[in-house]
């Protein structure tokens, strides 16, 4: 889908660049596949702010997207493509031969009327799901499981994908968008193709108000705060902080390694950080 620009009648319109969603379904989602979603405003169960600069935003209904695709060897027809406010990718409503409906992530080049199926050995076409070990090397995949039967976790946002670049006994080697290469078990399943809406990265919000509609509040820098509020705060006039960048709680930021999960290091063949050096 193409990008839309607008006549500069206001400063917000001048900057605005949006994805043209005219080809998507314009009605309401399937009620049985949606549920209510209450905004937390960045608070946890004790009422304390755990994520700063969150709150407000437009009311949204959560669409239950099927990341597992557990119905094997039952063909389904794509009924329509829909916008989903909860994610950057588009979603597709599919209807199985037994009449059951489900939402799935829509891959690129999926169209209304297409047939998709999940199974151990299926055609290599966008939207079909099969174990990674049964796919040919070089296949582009998305919504990839990291644990067998858990449901897709990798490559789910707009325009993303992973590529199978090799095999190692029971595992396949996946190259992710970040440049990381990691081992994933061959019995883990993935959907073929790249995720829809690749132009999302080229959009421009246009104005602060649209960011508020998304539930994001203004983000203030530490150097403009008082010393009581942030380690970078205080000083007469504009200062640069005077110390290495830290979080509001004094922990080093901007490049400080925070990964503590050592148990899965053995699955990472090429780190996404090493690639950038």
Swiss-Prot record:
It comes from Nitrobacter winogradskyi (strain ATCC 25391 / DSM 10237 / CIP 104748 / NCIMB 11846 / Nb-255). GO terms for biological process: cytoplasmic translation. Keywords: Ribonucleoprotein, Ribosomal protein, RNA-binding, rRNA-binding. This is Large ribosomal subunit protein uL2. The gene is rplB. The keyword rRNA-binding applies. Belongs to the universal ribosomal protein uL2 family. Part of the 50S ribosomal subunit. Forms a bridge to the 30S subunit in the 70S ribosome. One of the primary rRNA binding proteins. Required for association of the 30S and 50S subunits to form the 70S ribosome, for tRNA binding and peptide bond formation. It has been suggested to have peptidyltransferase activity; this is somewhat controversial. Makes several contacts with the 16S rRNA in the 70S ribosome. Transmembrane segments: none annotated. Residues 209-220 have a biased composition (Basic residues). GO terms for molecular function: rRNA binding; structural constituent of ribosome; transferase activity. Residues 199-277 are annotated as: Disordered. GO terms for cellular component: large ribosomal subunit.
């Amino acid at each position: 889908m193409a990008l839309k620009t607008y006549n500069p009648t206001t400063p917000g319109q001048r900057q605005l660049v949006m994805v043209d969603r005219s080809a998507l379904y314009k009605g309401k989602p399937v009620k049985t596949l949606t549920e209510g979603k209450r905004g937390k405003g960045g608070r946890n169960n004790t009422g304390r702010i755990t994520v700063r600069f969150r709150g407000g935003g437009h009311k949204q209904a959560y669409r239950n997207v099927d990341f597992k695709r557990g119905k094997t060897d039952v063909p389904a027809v794509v009924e329509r493509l829909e916008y989903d406010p909860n994610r950057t990718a588009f979603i597709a409503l599919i209807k199985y031969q037994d009449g059951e409906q489900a939402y799935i992530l829509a891959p690129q080049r999926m169209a209304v009327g297409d047939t998709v199926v999940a199974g151990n050995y299926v055609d290599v076409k966008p939207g079909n799901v099969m174990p990674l070990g049964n796919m040919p090397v070089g296949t582009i995949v998305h919504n990839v499981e990291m644990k067998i039967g858990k449901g897709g976790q990798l490559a789910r946002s707009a325009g993303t994908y992973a590529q199978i670049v090799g095999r190692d006994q029971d595992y396949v080697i996946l190259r992710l968008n970040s440049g990381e290469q990691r081992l994933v078990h061959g019995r883990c399943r993935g959907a073929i193709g790249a995720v829809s809406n690749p132009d999302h990265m080229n959009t421009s919000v246009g104005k602060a108000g649209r960011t508020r509609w998304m539930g994001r509040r203004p983000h203030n820098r530490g150097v403009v705060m008082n010393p009581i509020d942030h380690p970078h705060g205080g000083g007469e006039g504009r200062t640069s902080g005077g110390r290495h960048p830290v979080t509001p709680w004094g922990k080093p930021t901007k490049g400080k390694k925070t990964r503590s999960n050592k148990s899965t290091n053995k699955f990472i063949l090429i780190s996404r950080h090493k690639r950038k050096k």
